[in-house]
Amino acid sequence: TNVGNALGTALFLFFLLHGLGQPSAVAQDNLLLLIVVYTVFVVIASVVTGIVSDRTGNRRTLTVAATVVQAASGVAIALVPTFEMTMVAAALMGLGYGAFSTVGLAFAADLLPDEQDHARDLGIVNVTAALGQLIGPVLGAGLVALVGGFWLVFVAAAVLSLVGGLLTAFARHPVRTS
């Protein structure tokens, strides 16, 4: 899911410049708007879904739903590649990623097998998240080069987000050793 998020966010400026043909100054201003919209929705989703998750305990469902919302952002922009839809996609991506990053981490913590290794295990979770942010832009650049446009980047972002949801849906609680 982090790769899907990185595919969408890391290439926004290039999409505005080369996908939508915006002049450099306009694209830079619009990138700022996209970042603000994305960030506002990340914060809102993080807080709200964190509270809902704590109250209901239904972390798996919320985490999977977050991946579907994030995937919807990729589908939306692939189908309607306009700046207006890019704003909608940024909001959806922010909602999905904010919810996923908060509730997904809580869900991952619930799945940790041994209390004495929680810090190590959460370190591994953090490394995988960081790798997703590293891999996304490189993969995205390759996909743009492959098809000469951005549609495949957004489709891949949607697919990878859904794969993250499927993996979450089938994650199993381990047998605790302590």
Model-predicted segments: where are they?
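Short amphipathic helix-loop junctions that connect adjacent transmembrane helices
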Residues: 10-29
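Helix-to-loop junctions at the C-terminal end of transmembrane segments
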Residues: 44-58
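Structural signature of the two symmetry-related core transmembrane helices
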Residues: 61-76
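Helix-loop junctions at membrane interfaces in 12-TM secondary transporters
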Residues: 78-89
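A late C-terminal transmembrane helix in Major Facilitator Superfamily
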Residues: 116-146
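A membrane-interface helix-boundary motif in multi-pass transporters
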Residues: 140-161
